[in-house]
Structure formats: C-alpha cells, structure tokens
Amino acid sequence: MIYGEVTLTIIDNDKKVKIRKKNTIVNLSALLPLITSTTSTAGSIITPYIQTNAGNIPVTYSVQPYESGYVFIFTGSFSQPSNIISAFLYPSSLSTFQQPIASIVYSREITGVTSIEWAIYVDDATGLLYNALLPNIITSTNFLSALYADDGNTNALLTLGAYQHYVYAYFSDATISKAINYINAHYFTFIDYTTSPSAITIGNNFALQLVPASTGQHTVFYYLWNSQNFTMQFSFSSGSSPLADGFVVCMYATTPPIALNTSSVTGMTNGTLAYGEGNQICVEFDPYSSQPISVTQWNGSGYVSTLLSSSGAGTGTSMTANDIFVLEITVSGTTMTVTVTDVTANKTIASQSVTLPFTPPSYGYAIITARNENDYANWSLVNIVDWYPYSIQIPTSYVSPQLLPITAIFNTD
C-alpha cells in the first residue's frame, strides 16, 4: 500500500494556517519496472524537488515509522509567498527515476503558500519501495532487486519482473515427486557487487552467497529496519587460512547507501564498506584478526572515529566450514554488545561491548557489506526466514516438478 498527503502552509492575517489534502500517486507503474530492471545506477544524483505552477522548489527528506510501515516526508519552502494550484513530487529515486511519483491539483488557487510538506505513506512487505523512494544510491555502480526463494527442496535467486502495480517472479522446482508445502520468499536489494549473488547449498542448508571464495570481492545489501538491534545468520564452505574479510554492518543510516569506502580506517582490519547519511555505527567482523570485531562511527561525510579496534591482523580466528554462525548486535542505552556464535558447535567465536557516543534511534537503514580482499571465504546468508524482515512464507500444496509464480501487488489509495 502506498498513498500520500500534501500539507500547504499559508500566511493568513499574520497566522500560519495548514491546508492538508490527499494526493494522487502517479507513475507507480513506471517506478516498479525501474526497480526490477535497473542493472546500474546513473553517474550523478538529482536532488529531489517539487514542481509547482509557481516554480520548482528543492526539498529535504526524512523517513519515520508509521503504523506498520514508514512515512517518507519531503519538505520545501518558497522564497516568497506563492499561489498554488498544482504540484508534482519528483523524488529522483534510484538516481534515474526522473518522473513524478505523486501529483495534486486543487479545485481553487491556494494563495500565500510559504512551504509544502509532502508525506508518502508506505506499507510494503517486500521492502522494495523502502529502498527505492529515497534518491541517495551509490552512483555508477551495479544494482539488483531480486527474490531469493526456497521451498524445502531447492532454492534460487530470481529475476523480478513488473507490470503496472505487480512485481512477479517464477520459481522452478525441478525435483521429482517431492511435496511442496510452502515457499519462502525474501526480497533483496543488492548494489556495488563485484560478482552477482547466487543461490547455493552449504552442507544441508540452502544459502544465498554474497561473495565467492576469491580475492577482490564485495557485495552490499541494505534494508529499512525498525530496531536498535541486528541479527544475521551466515555460513561458508570454502576459504583461505586465515579467513577474511567477513562483514561490516552499518546501522542507523537515514538513507540508503551513498558511498563505498575502500581506504584504510583506523582500528579496522579492512576498510571496504558502504555507508549512508546521518550518524551511524559500523560494526566489522573480520576473522582475519584474532580479535575480529571493530566498531566505528560514521556520518554522510565518511569516517568519524574508532570506538573499538580489532587486533592481531593476520593471525586469524578459528571458524569451521559448513557451520552456521549468528552475528548479533544488541543495544541497551548507549552500550552496544556484538557477539558472533557458532550455533552448530555451540560456542562463542567473538564477543565485545562498547560505549556509543550517542543513543541510537529505534529505526534506520541497515547497510551490510560482505567482502574479500587478498584472503577470502564464500560468505553466505542462511536461515533467512528466521531473521530477515522482508521474508514471506507462502503456504502451498503441490508435488514437484512445478513452476510456481510469486506475485506482489502494490495498491494505491
């Protein structure tokens, strides 16, 4: 579901008066195909703006939780009071969507307008619109919206298609005479990947491989998340000795990723990570180090400070191939605790606590970078339905082989 509301502020007898009206969502049928078909982003970012009959105004934007979803708020002001009859919102999503996402026409001219606030309310179980509506995407880089699915018999990373308000994919189970009682569907947005993510099997577990076991690899995925805490389950089946370079999780960003850092950072074993706007905490787990956890503070300009340094680079942290690991980040007040556990062996791999320089918000974008430089492992996500917020289990009653359509419908109000 997606809908919008426009608030005009006018001056009436030296008093501020607000006029609110629902708007019309337009071009969703143009945005959805762009989300599903974009393979690379533009070379520059166009600032969001509102076009009116009185001229264009640049806007700032923010995102906040609202009911079971989020509201994206675009705000702009006129240099002098203006008379408004129509307006169009251009979010410049994905740096390439240069059409209005919403429009509004008033039955009479509204005089003396000083500012416009345009709220777009989104409740999206796929997470795709949460990732697409804000414009700050790393420029000139790979982009992939995809559906990772499994049914207990097989798994696949599926290309998405779109038609009008529909997003769809086709899942093929080619096994013979096996029951299909469910399909787990997980929508992901990947950017700046060196090698395309893929569906694999590690041991007896279906897995989504983020990077292969080779040098010079990284992959970024991100999502909007309504918690101070973070959990991720992962595994690997092959790699060097010692292993590298693990993951960096940047939490509390106010936007999707805006840049990829590849330079050295004080206290980190490896500085390759994507980050967004706003005050954020980046947690590195790199088993190439004997103390494999570092915690750093970042903002939209880049690195700010090191709160916890990793140590013993090159000595390695013992991990067992094919085991399942849990990376868990919990926050209590300003204390952050990072723990990595081998749940197969029932042992703790690493655990550290650190005091944060600010109390983190209860929502924001989580930006995860998996990376390999000179040493490596095929870092992969497992048990995704247990921890990833944009996961949907669809009950079915079939026997393989089957070709099964998976469809998401986006409604406007």
Swiss-Prot record:
Instruction: Please report the record's description of how this protein sits within the membrane.
Output: Single-pass membrane protein
Please give the GO cellular component terms listed in this UniProt entry.
host cell membrane; membrane
InterPro entries to which the protein is assigned, alphabetical: ConA-like_dom_sf
List locations, semicolon-separated. Answer: Host membrane
| Signal peptide residue numbers | none
Q: TM segments?
A: 25-47
Keywords of this entry: Host membrane, Membrane, Transmembrane, Transmembrane helix
Q: What protein name does the entry list?
A: Uncharacterized protein ORF413
Q: Which organism is it from?
A: Acidianus filamentous virus 2 (isolate Italy/Pozzuoli) (AFV-2)
